[in-house]
Amino acid sequence: RILPVIGQGNHNAQIMFIGEAPGANEDKTGVPFCGRAGEILNLLLTSVGIKREDVYIANILKDRPPANRKPATEEITACTAYLLRQIAIIEPKIIATLGNYATHFILEKFGVPDSQLGISRLRGKKFPVQDPTTQNPYIIIPLYHPAVAVYNSRSLDELKSDFKIIGEQLKSAGDNL
């Protein structure tokens, strides 16, 4: 571990993006989504008229797992309270989960049935939830992780389509960033 990656963005954001864990670039800079996946995330945000500085970005884990392995249960446990506190402080209207792992984790934390379905079945759907502790309402929208487009350029169109759902949700709520 070089630097912890706590999170970054607007503390009054209407949208909070949550990924799994920092990668190598993030570990070096302390900035979430600053590598190739971050470039794609920026492109996707721009495609729906959202500025990166208007959102908040975090990961479940705050440190990169060694050798990019899946997070261990102990690591998740150590970071869960911090992430839930970040969500409560930011109070976003939308929580956009990036990838299978973050989607399963967040949907399960908020008690959503079928939270273990694959991301291809959950992506782009809206799950209205309420935080049992703070009573804050959120809409969770699972999305493919932007890194998918690094390995499969055809998936960029699916990602853009999913990001349109976020833009539409903001407009329907009367919130323009």
Outline where the language-model segments fall.
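A polyanion-binding, active-site-adjacent surface
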Residues: R1-L177
